[in-house]
Amino acid sequence: MAAGNSSWARAAFTFKATVFKKSRYVIYYSLLEHRFSLSLWGILKYSGIYFCTEILRSFPKKRCKSHPYRVDGYPAGSCLDPPLHEPLDTSTPKKISLVSCSNSYMRNKTDNGKVGSRNVSEYKLEGDFASTSKSIYYKLNNLEKMNRKLAWIEAVSSEFSFWEKLRSKQIFPFQNEKDLIAEPFNYELAVSHRRPVIYESISLVPRSVTRTLSRFKAELTNQSNLNLSVHNKFDLAKNQASVSLQYVGFLLFLFPIQIAIENWFLEPRIRGWWNIRQIQLFSNVFQEENALKQLREAEALFWLDDVIGNLADTQLQNFDTDARNETTRLAMMYDELNIQLLLRLATNAISIATLFPLLIFGRKRLAVLNSWIQELFYSLNDTMKAFSILLLTDLCVGFHSPHGWEILVQSLFEYFGLTPNKYVTPCFVSTFPVILDTLFKYWIFRHLNRTSPSIVATYHTMSE
């Protein structure tokens, strides 16, 4: 059982670790891709603005024909040359605020009209530099935010890895607390440091049964001195076991309630109604045939007794009286059978009407119960699992199972007061076990081959 739990927990941990690594890789890749795209976009934009400026500065003087009066005020170098009293360094972009632009504009406005046209194109270029600088500054701030996000993701992933390793230690319950603290992040090393399993003595009771009972007792009593993660696991198992037992106890508690309602509430009313408004004595033809057969057998016995006991008296005076008493007894017997039949039908209808809403509204508890039963089944060793499967299949679809199905079908017919049909029972016995056997084989092929192939091998070996 310990090896099975260890392999199952190891597989679950490996799957969770793989999913977490893939998710972390996607997050890292997306953030780094976004960061690289922002950096590349800023570099390209800055380079494009710079080269465009250099191209405009290299244009000849004849481009300024629309403003011929500017030649008098500036040399014939370029129409975009800055004034001598305010040099502009285009080698590095600087942050230029709106206030500085407005001050420069107002200061240059007092000059002659020849300078006005120059200021328009110049401050247009300076506005481009300002917008570029602000954009780059904003992107740099975004890069800092991205770096902080990456650091936060690394911290969270480290913490998550630490807690995952703590949970993984529950796979190896024989590892002490010192090893747990010394190796919080090394799963493979923890595997290598496991202690050997203590030898268990052989007894008449299978060890898997004793281990299952011990585990069940530990889940209920919480007698565990393991670390925090193992303690949480036992708390979860304890809650699962308690919820399952409470749900089963609640369903079993319905049977005493059903018996109480049947005896104290339904039976007096049904009995009074049947005795007052009785239409016929027999509810079906099958009861009538059985009553007639029993009456004939009783009359034959009475006649034989009278003949043997009264050899001298040939009139047989007591025969009619005994036959009449037997008829009255049979009538009372079948009358009681009909009352019990109506009582069972009413009780079953109330039980079904109560049970279905409980199952529908208690789907979560039913799922917990299902998982708990599966866990108890899979906690057994492979031999016990194969033995349980063989026992169930032989009882339901084995060589002698048709006789049991016939008895079950006839009992159901009698329970509900129906007439047995000579065609329904053979048809059911010949088809239903075959369908059930097919479902068993499909379950073994589809489910057990994936979860535990060793169970399938043991099952085939035991069945052969």
Swiss-Prot record:
This is Potassium/proton antiporter CemA. GO terms for biological process: potassium ion transport. Pfam families: CemA (PF03040). GO terms for cellular component: chloroplast inner membrane. Belongs to the CemA family. Signal peptide: none annotated. InterPro entries: CemA. GO terms for molecular function: antiporter activity; proton transmembrane transporter activity. Its main location: plastid. It is found in: Plastid, Chloroplast inner membrane. The chain crosses the membrane at residues 36-56, 241-261, 341-361, 389-409, 425-445. It is a multi-pass membrane protein. It catalyses: K(+)(in) + H(+)(out) = K(+)(out) + H(+)(in). Keywords: Antiport, Chloroplast, Hydrogen ion transport, Ion transport, Membrane, Plastid, Plastid inner membrane, Potassium, Potassium transport, Transmembrane, Transmembrane helix, Transport. Contributes to K(+)/H(+) antiport activity by supporting proton efflux to control proton extrusion and homeostasis in chloroplasts in a light-dependent manner to modulate photosynthesis. Prevents excessive induction of non-photochemical quenching (NPQ) under continuous-light conditions. Indirectly promotes efficient inorganic carbon uptake into chloroplasts. It comes from Adiantum capillus-veneris.
